Each structure stands twice: as C-alpha cells, then as structure tokens.
Regions:
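N-terminal secretory signal peptides
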Residues: 1-23
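Conserved hydrophobic/aromatic pocket- or pore-lining residues that grip, position, or stack substrates
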Residues: 84, 106, 128, 134, ...
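Short glycine/serine-rich loop/turn segments
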Residues: 126-266, 319, 434-454
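Short, well-ordered alpha-helical
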Residues: 15-16, 21, 26, 30-152, ...
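Structural helix-boundary/capping segments
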Residues: 90, 168, 172, 216-323, ...
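Acyltransferase
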Residues: 77-82, 111-114, 327-353, 377-382, ...
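Short helix-loop capping/hinge segments that flank enzyme active sites or metal/cofactor-binding pockets
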Residues: 126-146, 303-317, 348, 366-421, ...
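Small-aliphatic-rich amphipathic alpha-helix that forms the alpha element of a beta-alpha
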Residues: 421, 453-479
Length: 523
C-alpha cells in the first residue's frame, strides 16, 4: 500500500490501529547506543573560543541565536545536534522528557542541512535546528504512542502535516517527547512522568509535560505541544518557558492523535517569543487534509516583532486576574501590565467570564470526554484493560454523555464564547495568569484515577486556560518572574481570533525589558 492509501486511512487525525514494528524499548536501547557513539569525544569548535562564546552552555542559547551561527557557518548543524544528543544522554535519565531519541535520523538530517547551507541553499531560521515534538505527532516509521499503552509500537505510515512542514523548513528531529496518556491529565504506569527541572517536587504541567521539561532544560531548541484545555500553556507556566497556542485551524491537526477534535490545537514551545514566532510561521498554513484548517494568510510576525506597540491595547480585569491566583503571581503580572503601559500600550478595562468558571469547566469536561470517547472507539471499551486508571475512567465518563447532553454543552459553549469574544474584540490582548504557579505534587500522584487527580485539575486554575480553547483564540504564555523560592511565574496574553501578531509583539516588547529568558534551571 502506498503513502496516499495510508493517508486516506489516517484521515481521522491519528486513532488508527497500532502497527507492528520495533518496540519502543528496543528502539530506545538501539538509539542510545548510536547516541553514545556519535557524541563520544565531543569538543568545542574553535570559533567559540575566538568569539568568547561558551560552547558548554550553548544548549541554553535561543533558537534564533544558534540560527544566526548556522547561517554564518560559525557552527554546523552536526555540531549542534551532537551537543544536544550528548546533553540528552547526560541529563534526561533524571528528567524523563524524551520518550524516544532519534539520534541516527537527527544526525542524517543535520548532515543534509550542513550540505544545503554550505551550498547557499538556506531554507530559513529553522534550517539545521535540533527540535523535538510531543509524542502524538505522526512520524513516519518512527514509533508514536501518545502516552498510550494501547498504541505501543505503533509506526505511523506517514508524517503529520506539522512534521512535513518542519522537515521542509530544514529542522532536525531529536526525538519524541513524553506526555500524559492520550493528552489528558493522568499517566499510564508504563510511561515515565517528566520531572520539572526547577524542582523535582514541582508539577511539570500537563499534557505537553515532556515538551516543557525538554525545552526548559536545554534538551532541544524548540518543541511542539498540543493544547485542548491548557496543555501548551500549563507546561510553559510550570517550566518557565514560552508557549503559544495559535488560533484554531491555523496549524493543521492532520496526523496528530486527537483528544477532542473541536478543542485540539498544536503550537510551539520555546525559550523566547521570537523563537515561538519562527516555529509558528513554519508550521502554520492551509492544509487540504484538515477540514478545519484555515485559508487565512499567515502573517510574517518575525518581520514586525520590533515594531512600536503604541497602537496596541491590553485588557485587564482585576477580579479575573486575582481569581484563585496567589498574591505573588498577581503582583508579578501587575508589573507586566505596568511595563507594557510604560512602553506604549494602552490599558482597557474588560470583564472576563470569571463568574462562569464552574459552568466553563463542567461544559469543557462534557465536550472533551464525549469527543475523546468517540476518538478512541476503535480501542475503548474493547481494550479497556490496556488503558491507565485516569484515562480509562475519563473515557467511561464520555460514554455516558448522550448526544443530547453534548448538544446542550455545545450551546453553553457558544454562549460563553460570545461573552469571551466580545471582551477580546476590544483589545489586542487580555493580560492574565496562564494557570497559577507550579505547585508541589507527590511522586506518582498522576498515575491515579479521576478522584486522585481532581485536586490537580483545580490547582491549575482552568478558568484561565479553557476559554481560549473553547473559542479557538490565540494565546501566548511567557515568563514574568520568580517567587522567593525560585518557582517560575508566567503571564498569559490572550488575543482575539487570528491575533497572533498582536500577542507576539506585546510579548516580545515585554521580554526585551526583562532577563527572565536568560535564567535557566541548574541541570
């Protein structure tokens, strides 16, 4: 069967039958051996000494910084890739961010990038850059499991559209990143829980936890995550990095394992706003294979990041800002607001639907569980025993949602969206928390069922994250300080539909006044 035939069978965005292939555990063993051989005896190239650049810390450089070095041929993609593989080998045994390291593939792609760049055929800012992706993006011939035992050893017959776009941009794939089971909240016991590099006792976010940890710890220069109720923004918050959830339909979901098709978004996770804009521009755009894909032109955000922000408006709702948030975080976000005003942005008072937080959460659970149950119809309940405790219970709850209940939830969603979108229409960004602060969590707690994990959900302050998934509007999460204990604080900029440029310009302008992006965990 050729690739086109396989694509037809995969048009449900990912939940096809698991294919036979090499086991994930065997692949990890084989690839680790390749990594050790590729990275032995790694030494710093002389250009770093000449330019007073610290090669030992290049893993914490931004994507944009190393992209400049690649473009000027002051470093090669192979050197960068070998350095990243060596760091993964040295550090990730404790952090568990990677589900699979694709060393051989990465080095082959890096060699190709070096040849093209040397020939004057540089494709753009991602060319030769080592990146990683959440393990729900189809990668042809490379295991993709989505944190699901039921998809163990699944070898996708084609690449997700986002992977095709990354490859076309010349990116180098370091590997696939760990995540919660099925992109929900709990983990299957056969999978490792990624460890927050700021503190092993701290929540690492869900569900793109591996993406957040790897990006924060300098184990890739950018990663992809998915967001259904906050799953890009919460790990970005927890790990002190930048996370961007684009407008629904801006980035194709084709070839991405679904959680809930009307809520799922794919977006970049990086160490700077400029980097997020670069990855967004590479992966966004119309895709005929995704019926929800938008035909709107993708803006060239990178060319306008440095622009004046005096024409931009920021919305603030003091009561919404404070709802459930600790005082330290509130103060940090107020400083963001003051800074944006001081450099030209106009403050506008808005009224966010904070009083509907319980209705919002209940409606989200109804819609998400119903759609998740439909997405897993091929394997649940027929293989229910292969699911982890939490996700099995979540799918069961979805099986009890009637079509009538789902339709009623859809009407409530549209009502809440009208309130939310009306306020967003007044501004370029609403400034608010992205989901609280990283909190302490007991080891292994996320292996439990719904009752055990419910307190975790509440601690994430879902009223800050769920509205943008409901409405499909873009948001940007970025660091805005640290607590006295050294825990990262983050702020969220929630924009109107297709408002990626505005939130990135505001985020970039704020970022230039601070040094949060230069502070990294001690790993």
């Amino acid at each position: 069967m050729d690739n086109n035939d396989q694509k037809g069978k995969g048009s449900d965005n990912g939940c096809c039958s698991a294919a036979n292939g090499i086991s994930r555990r065997d692949a990890t063993r084989i690839i680790s051996t390749v990594t050790a051989g590729a990275c032995s005896g790694l030494s710093a190239p002389s250009i770093f000494g000449a330019k007073s650049l610290n090669f030992d810390a290049i893993h914490y450089a931004t994507l944009s910084e190393v992209s400049e070095l690649l473009g000027s041929r002051e470093i090669s993609s192979v050197e960068l890739t070998e350095a990243q593989l060596a760091r993964i080998d040295a550090v990730d045994a404790e952090l568990h961010s990677y589900a699979l390291v694709t060393a051989e593939l990465a080095l082959a792609q890096a060699r190709q990038a070096d040849r093209e760049i040397a020939a004057g055929n540089r494709r753009g800012p991602l060319h030769g850059i080592p990146i990683a992706v959440k393990d729900l993006c189809y990668t042809q011939g490379v295991p993709t499991e989505g944190g699901l035992k039921v998809y163990e050893n699944f070898l996708p017959p084609f690449d997700a559209t986002v992977m095709t776009k990354l490859y076309e941009a010349g990116a180098v794939l370091l590997g696939k990143l760990n995540m919660t089971e099925g992109a929900m909240v709990g983990y299957h016991r056969d999978f490792e829980i990624p460890v927050n590099p700021w503190g092993a006792n701290l929540f690492a976010g869900v569900s793109s936890s591996g993406s957040g940890v790897a990006t924060a710890a300098g184990l890739c220069y950018a990663s992809l995550g998915s967001d259904t109720g906050g799953s890009i923004r919460l790990p970005a918050m927890a790990n002190g990095i930048v996370g961007m959830k684009p407008t629904y339909g801006r980035v194709s979901r084709y070839g991405v394992m679904p959680l809930a098709e009307s809520l799922d978004h794919i977006g970049p996770m990086t160490r700077s706003v400029r980097d997020a804009a670069a990855v967004f521009q590479a992966i966004a755009g119309r895709d005929v294979n995704d019926p929800t894909s938008l035909s709107d032109e993708v803006p060239n955000i990178l060319s306008r990041l440095d622009g004046d922000i005096s024409s931009l408006r920021i919305g603030v709702d003091e009561s919404f800002l404070r709802l459930g948030s600790p005082e330290g975080l509130v103060m940090a976000i107020q400083k963001v607001i003051n800074t944006l005003q001081s450099i030209g942005a106009t403050l506008v008072e808005v009224k966010m639907p904070g009083e509907f937080s319980q209705q919002l959460r209940d409606t989200w659970v109804t819609i998400c569980s119903y759609e998740a149950h439909k997405a897993h119809a091929a394997t649940y309940p027929s293989r229910a025993n292969e699911y982890g405790e939490y996700f099995r219970e979540f799918l069961h709850s979805g099986s009890e949602v009637s079509d009538s209940d789902y339709n009623a939830a859809g009407r409530e969603r549209r009502r809440l969206n009208r309130i939310f979108e009306n306020e967003l229409s007044k501004v370029d960004a609403v400034v608010c928390p992205s989901g609280g602060v990283p909190f302490e969590i007991a080891p292994g707690a996320q292996y439990g069922g719904m009752d055990a994990i419910s307190p975790v959900l509440s601690s994430m302050l879902p009223h800050n994250s769920m509205p943008a998934d409901f409405a499909g509007t873009p948001t940007l999460t970025l660091p805005c300080g640290f607590s006295d204990e050294g825990v990262p604080y983050s702020v969220q900029l929630m924009g109107p539909r297709l408002g990626e440029e505005g939130i990135c310009r505001l985020g970039y302008a704020y970022e230039q006044t601070m040094d949060w992006q230069t502070r990294h965990p001690a790993v």
